[in-house]
Amino acid sequence: MGALINNLLYLRYPTRHCTYKLAKFSTGCGLWQDVRMASGPGLPDSLVLEIFLHLPHKAVLSAGFTCRQWFAVSRDEFLWKELLYNYYCIPRSVPRHPAAVSWYREFKRLYDCIPCVEVQTLKEHHDQVLHLAFSHRGHRFSSCSKDCTVKLWDTERSDGTISLVHSSSMRQFNWGYTQFSQFNVDDTLLLVSGVYLGPHQSSSGEIAVISLENYTLLSRVRNKPYDVFGCWLNETHLISGNLHWIGNMTSCSVLWLNKAFQDIESENVNVVKRLFKIQNINASTIRTVMVAHCRRHDSPDLLLDYEAQSKAQAQQTQQHQPLFFDLGNTDSEEEEDEDKEDKEDEEDEERGEKRVSAHLPSFNPSGIQHVIHGRQSIAARERELETKVARLMGSRRTKAPDPNLVSPSAHGEGEDKTYLLFTTGSLTYSPHQIGIKRIMPDQMTTCGPVLGEERSTDEFFDSLDHVIDIHGHIIGMGLSPDHRYLYVNSRAWPAGCVISDPMSPPPIAEEIDLHVIDLKSLREERRSLRAHRAFTPNDECFFIFLDVSRDFVASGAEDKHGYIWDRHYNICLARLKHDDVVNSVAFSPADQELLLSASDDSTIKVWRSPRMVRLAEAPQRPPRARKLLSSLLGRRSANLNGKP
């Protein structure tokens, strides 16, 4: 590096009578060992700037302490703009963050304010840790684990460490493990979701509501399938799910609104109310429900793919249409008796097998393969026929959507909207679509009929207001703090794949894509993030929880790392190491420079930014002594007021 700078000086000023001696430059520590001028005037600012452009940012900061001139150049805006674009490999089409006041401070934010320094490891769990959730104030967080406990932790200790406050075991309720938790808006109640191990209910889950005042159990709610998870709608009401099979491949998902505690003042007050009934085809179900309170979208637009957006605006193309379509005419089917349908399907399958066995050839390998192929063909035809019947019957039994309920918000629109978001599917059982259903104000209470408003037989099912197809297996979702953007983890299907059998979804990629959906325009942004990996196949694929702060988005991965990206520049800023799969991450809502990560290695790691670590380790300054002049003035003032 020193030779490079000397060559630059010689080429730029070969005839000057002043010589500049640059001693050894240590790239490891990034410090100038000796920089002095033998004779002649100082270097011009333009030359110093050119030299600094060839140095790492640490060397620029160190060189800035040489003299006042170099310090001024080391804070040059053009210099730090170039350093930022080059260091993070950001495309030049991406502008500076709209909230940034300078390029120097923006570089400092990206480099020094990322929670990437491990400061504590929590080992109180004895099995895989599956989920983390902060309270809205950030003073506590909860953790769920396969050890079937939910634990509460305190983050406001005077020494800056995190300590365990409370632990509740859910095995007494016949749970297999806890998988998800969420604080209500005022941080007085905790929703805990787990997998219930009751008889013949392998897919069933349960939701428990715990008071954070005295840690008592307030209520328990059935939740099927268990990966609906559940969520809060407001301070006192939560949403759960139930599933009714009406065929081998067709089912009905019912979403319920539940009071968080049993009302004992009157037996006439409802504690539950049905929100929606939605038809599922091709063995798909509704999962991962969450509520987005979109309050007028006053936040600025988060531009993610600047080149694509500029081209789209110039050409006014319709590239987003495949990702933004209406399911108002979704085919659905009338619900019938589940046991009766199962028996009829079993009898049909037995008759099909008998027809095949009647034409069974001699027992040789080719004959066996022919029989197996015949059975598979019959099963596939039966599934295809069931789907066609479900679509036909459902088209006559689904409530028509109101196009005004969910529509892209116009600029300056003042109406608040509440959306119910969930994963679903239409082609196969693996979740590959985001369903959006608006919740109206009169639906946010359990008052009124338990089964909701009266409807005719032609309105048996509720239609989805909008669906966004991700074209891959969805393994995680998270909302931005302002609830405008939905971030989705998915593993993509091969391009151009065709699904002929809903029970055999396409193979999924090892890379995890992180998509961003703008709930204002109801579109998926074209540019997705890809840096983390997963390796499990379709039938073993599990949920990877992600979290979003004001400036960053973080996610776990199966490659034993957590990842942090910048939301504006779409760049990966840090990798957080664990000894096994990272299942969940969580930013503190009070301080985005504090991050938690949970792993299959049974630990929770606490990460803070380099800036916060330095502040915590810096010795506290002693109180400043009162100056003599201020002391004399204080005494004089006291004497004037008549005090001795």
Regions found by a protein language model. Give the residues of each.
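A short helix->beta-strand "capping" segment at the edge of beta-propeller domains
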Residues: R105-D127, T161-S169, E453-V467, E525-F535
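Skp1-binding F-box subdomain of Cullin-RING ligase substrate receptors
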Residues: K24-V119, C148
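Structural hallmark of WD40 beta-propellers
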Residues: V60, G138-S142, T188-L191, T236-S240, ...
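Canonical WD40 repeat/beta-propeller blade segments in eukaryotic WD-repeat proteins
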Residues: D127-A133, Q172-Q182, Y226-C231, H473-M477, ...
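Terminal intrinsically disordered, low-complexity extensions flanking WD-repeat/beta-propeller proteins
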Residues: S219, P225-G230, L243-I475, V498-H515, ...
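Conserved strand-to-loop turn within each blade of WD40 beta-propeller repeats
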Residues: C144-D147, S490-R491, G556-D559, A598-D601
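WD40-repeat beta-propellers
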Residues: L132, V150-T155, Q201-E213, M249-N258, ...
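Loop/turn segments within WD40 beta-propeller blades
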Residues: L132-H139, F183-D186, C231-T236, D469, ...
